[in-house]
């Protein structure tokens, strides 16, 4: 059974912090072969949405308040364990992240920086392209935005 939790940075246990940094490192740095500084100073003001299964973190997003990365709230560091890919967990993770944004900040636009190969996935969740393609840490990205659902 999947256990979902959302916490502020100062509410995370040391084990939770270690697990989310480990998952982000495994996927974004090792698996994607992308050397970058994951610790960017944005974890502290963020909300951290975590999915645990049998005591192991298997999916995670970082939800940033308005004004941290963009004018709008932002969803970032979207990650699922390689063992859980193609199971629908990523879609569930994003749906819960959108719901969390709406609960925390009201029904306002949400922004994210998507890896280009995932553009259609985010479009299926109501996001639209909001800028030109650009390189972030050597990987093609595109800014996307989702208008509030009324």
Name each region found by the language model:
Residues 80, 86-99:
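Conserved acetyl-CoA-binding loop-helix of GNAT-fold acetyltransferases
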Residues 116-132, 137:
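Conserved active-site alpha-helix within GNAT-family acetyltransferase domains
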Residues 50, 56-66, 72-74, 79:
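Conserved beta-strand in the GNAT
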Residues 115-116, 135-150:
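C-terminal "cap" of GNAT-fold acetyltransferases
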Residues 66-75, 85, 104-108, 138-140:
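A conserved beta-turn-beta hairpin within the catalytic core of GNAT-like acetyltransferases
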Residues 39-44, 67, 135-136:
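A short beta-turn/loop motif at secondary-structure boundaries
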Residues 1-48, 52-56:
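Short amphipathic alpha-helix that is part of the acyltransferase structural core
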Residues 94, 101-114:
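Conserved GNAT acetyl-CoA-binding A-motif
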């Amino acid at each position: 059974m999947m256990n979902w939790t959302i916490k502020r940075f100062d509410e995370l246990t040391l084990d939770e912090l270690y697990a989310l940094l480990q998952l982000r490192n495994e996927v974004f740095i090792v698996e994607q072969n992308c050397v970058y500084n994951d610790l960017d100073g944005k974890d502290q003001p963020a909300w951290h949405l975590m999915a645990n299964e049998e005591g192991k973190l298997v999916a995670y997003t970082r939800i940033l308040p308005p004004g941290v990365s963009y004018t709008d709230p932002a969803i970032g560091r979207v990650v699922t364990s390689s063992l859980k890919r193609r199971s629908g967990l990523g879609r569930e993770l994003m749906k819960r992240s959108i719901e969390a944004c709406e609960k925390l900040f009201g029904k306002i636009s949400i922004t994210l920086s998507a890896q280009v190969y995932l553009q259609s996935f985010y479009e299926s969740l109501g996001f639209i392209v909001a800028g030109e393609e650009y390189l972030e840490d050597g990987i093609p990205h595109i800014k996307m935005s989702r208008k509030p659902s009324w």
